[in-house]
A protein has these predicted regions:
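Entry/capping segment at the start of metal-dependent catalytic domains
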Residues: 1
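Active-site-proximal helix-loop-helix substrate-binding element of RNase H-like nuclease domains
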Residues: 5, 9-158
């Protein structure tokens, strides 16, 4: 739905995939380049999700690290990914981004609305007469929530 990123600590960009925006080619290339280190909180989640996205939309760029003996194959090579959640655990910090940020006293705290926004946009909803029988909430169903979701995504990268 959304892809937020920053290059070398620069300004955070949020790509609105759900509304047709595309990830820049240089970022796609960086995601598949094992010489470029990628950092994320819960990096394995990001790596697996991006593997699926790249296989589906950029199959010519996707490079799997798997071998025939690998039972969980066809994902981006984890060797160029670093996980700040693992680092937090190593230092005895909470394993949530919000918890680690609070303990460290980070200036930019995780937005509290996030869980509700994730439920609204990322979890199927019950079809009702009120919602027109839909089973997914899309950006056009509540643009103000969608804009807040984009801010939430940006803050997570900051």
């Amino acid at each position: 739905l959304l892809f937020g990123y920053s290059v070398d600590g620069g300004e955070v960009a949020v790509i609105d995939i759900a509304q047709g925006e595309g990830i820049p080619t240089e970022i796609i290339d960086a995601l598949t380049d094992e010489q470029i280190t990628k950092w994320a909180f819960n990096a394995n989640f990001e790596r697996v999700c991006l593997s699926e996205y790249l296989r589906r939309f950029y199959p010519e760029k996707f490079i799997s690290y798997s071998t025939k003996e690998d039972s969980v194959s066809d994902y981006l090579d984890p060797s160029s990914w670093k996980c700040s959640m693992v680092w937090a655990a190593y230092m005895g910090l909470p394993l949530s981004l919000a918890g680690a940020g609070a303990v460290l006293g980070l200036e930019e705290q995780k937005l509290t609305e996030g869980k509700e926004l994730i439920r609204y946009f990322c979890v199927p909803c019950k079809a009702t007469k009120v919602n027109g029988g839909r089973t997914r909430n899309l950006p056009q169903h509540d643009m103000s929530k969608w804009e807040m979701f984009k801010k939430y995504n940006k803050r997570d990268v900051e």
